[in-house]
Amino acid sequence: MILVSTTSAVPGALSSPSSPSNSSQEELLDDRDPLLVRAELALLSTIFVAVALSNGLVLGALIRRGRRGRWAPMHVFISHLCLADLAVALFQVLPQLAWDATDRFHGPDALCRAVKYLQMVGMYASSYMILAMTLDRHRAICRPMLAYRHGGGARWNRPVLVAWAFSLLLSLPQLFIFAQRDVGNGSGVFDCWARFAEPWGLRAYVTWIALMVFVAPALGIAACQVLIFREIHASLVPGPSERAGRRRRGHRTGSPSEGAHVSAAMAKTVRMTLVIVIVYVLCWAPFFLVQLWAAWDPEAPLERPPFVLLMLLASLNSCTNPWIYASFSSSVSSELRSLLCCAQRHTTHSLGPQDESCATASSSLMKDTPS
């Protein structure tokens, strides 16, 4: 049996994959580096506030807009992405923060298993909701009639349900891997640890999670974005046969204003594609690289401060998700500005140009098309 100590949702963090012996029992019970503990608490607190505040603001803006009419399909996906990221904040970052503050997991075995399960649900849901959103955007652009026939303005649709269902199902192994276990041979100190029946179990499981949470969604997102860009390019830029037909009919192949419009649309698509893929990879890569390093290398520097802090960055992508999609959706960004403006007005209780700008922002939303 392999007993693995962890303060991460993924087994292998902050420990070596070996059972503690009597000689290492005192080492397990020693106090941690106080400076490192403060750094961990500060990092987790910052991430929690950033995730909760950013996703709460964007979700509030979407709910505020939804009260005035039917939600656009993209708004449905952004709202569920915000819910998934809020689940990361509440069920992953917050328990992790309490756990780091107390050093050991204090709670019954059922709570240990539930926390580990919900931590993984948040990781899967955040990644799969982005993938579902990208797949739906690909269908809407490349297969518009199919997208129209299936709708998409409902608060729950098929891709959203599939993303949540896969997140709940793929997280089930956490319930059987983790439990409250003695950290040493009869030490009397218990922690929420993972146990694998075979020596290769830890490496296989961490690799599986890296593939399913990071690698596979990243490849799917990148592939869909490339196909979307190709479809937009093909629809906006006429091909050789179409240009020849226009010349035979005496039509110009394009005007300067048309070319500028095409260039602007393509530039926005390229920017969005690059931002989505690059930010996704940059946010997830450090966490999974150190997780795989810890699982596969017995000599990994598990106690080094950079290594320990990188183990806590599983929720980094949840800080950036709402701002990426809000910035590329004119309706969401306008609603968010209106919400912040009105909140500032109610806070200051002042009347003047600020109220006028708030009212102007609110009224302009009625003419904004969902994007």
Swiss-Prot record:
InterPro entries: GPCR_Rhodpsn, GPCR_Rhodpsn_7TM, Vasoprsn_rcpt, Vprsn_rcpt_V2
Record-level GO BP terms: negative regulation of cell population proliferation; negative regulation of urine volume; positive regulation of cell population proliferation; positive regulation of gene expression; positive regulation of intracellular signal transduction; positive regulation of systemic arterial blood pressure; response to cytokine; telencephalon development
Keywords: Cell membrane, G-protein coupled receptor, Glycoprotein, Lipoprotein, Membrane, Palmitate, Receptor, Transducer, Transmembrane, Transmembrane helix
Gene designation per UniProt: Avpr2
UniProt protein name: Vasopressin V2 receptor
Compartment(s): Cell membrane
CDD domains the record matches: 7tmA_V2R
Residue numbers on the Cytoplasmic membrane side: 64-77, 136-159, 221-271, 329-371
Biased composition (Polar residues): 357-371
Positions of the UniProt region annotated as Disordered: 1-27, 240-259, 349-371
